[in-house]
């Protein structure tokens, strides 16, 4: 089964519709693949009716469906471990000392969303949904970000280029390393002591002391069946999620999944023909276009 999937919300309807229109016009009008929408809250009737009108395939809508870890659980756990007085711990992540210290440090590195509990919870929820959501029992999904626009006419069925042995089909993005990424590398070193499976010599697509390159999640095809049914992947991903790094180190879903793919040497291919634009910092235009027809790159 092949699905186009968006993690979105009612508030993002405008961006969702523009993205759907782009994907339908540039690609899906030829293949009519179904769309699946997942959100942390119920979708409104208006959201469902307007999105289903644009889709050339059928639409499915789902919500949480899985239990994700919220920031309060980590507040109480860490508070207990360092012998803080639990009676003094307020149920707000902003009042957690450890969180505040880590967030302040990350803010000094000019990172966004470091004080956003919703952002951290969303990263945790997306990864757990991909692994465990009961409605996501799909072979392959094309993960598309609300707001993304395809800039090339795509005449070939992208799913057909995905080989049985492939795990991920995407683009790469390189970013400056921050203290949270160094913490992830340390966590994986600790995991390495407990587990012998995997090549831990090179976690990222590319890395040096200052930069790391990872798989970009906002326009990628994933073999969910292979990921979900491979305990080696799920064990490492669950270990990283269980460490609380999404809250205390600002790990994103792309950080966690890319690290797992890198350690376990996932077979990956580059989406070289799929040009897209998300924002001024996130875009891609193919250098050679052997079969896509036309592009309108900025």
Curated annotation (Swiss-Prot):
It is found in: Cytoplasm; Nucleus. Keywords: Cytoplasm, Glycosyltransferase, Nucleus, Transferase. Signal peptide: none annotated. The keyword rRNA-binding does not apply. Its EC number is 2.4.1.-. One of its GO terms (biological process) is protein N-linked glycosylation. Gene3D superfamilies: Spore Coat Polysaccharide Biosynthesis Protein SpsA, Chain A (3.90.550.10). The active site is at 220 (nucleophile). The keyword Cytoplasm applies. One of its GO terms (molecular function) is alpha-1,2-mannosyltransferase activity. PANTHER family: ALPHA-1,2 MANNOSYLTRANSFERASE KTR1, O-GLYCOSIDE ALPHA-1,2-MANNOSYLTRANSFERASE HOMOLOG 6. This is O-glycoside alpha-1,2-mannosyltransferase homolog 6. It comes from Schizosaccharomyces pombe (strain 972 / ATCC 24843). The gene is omh6.
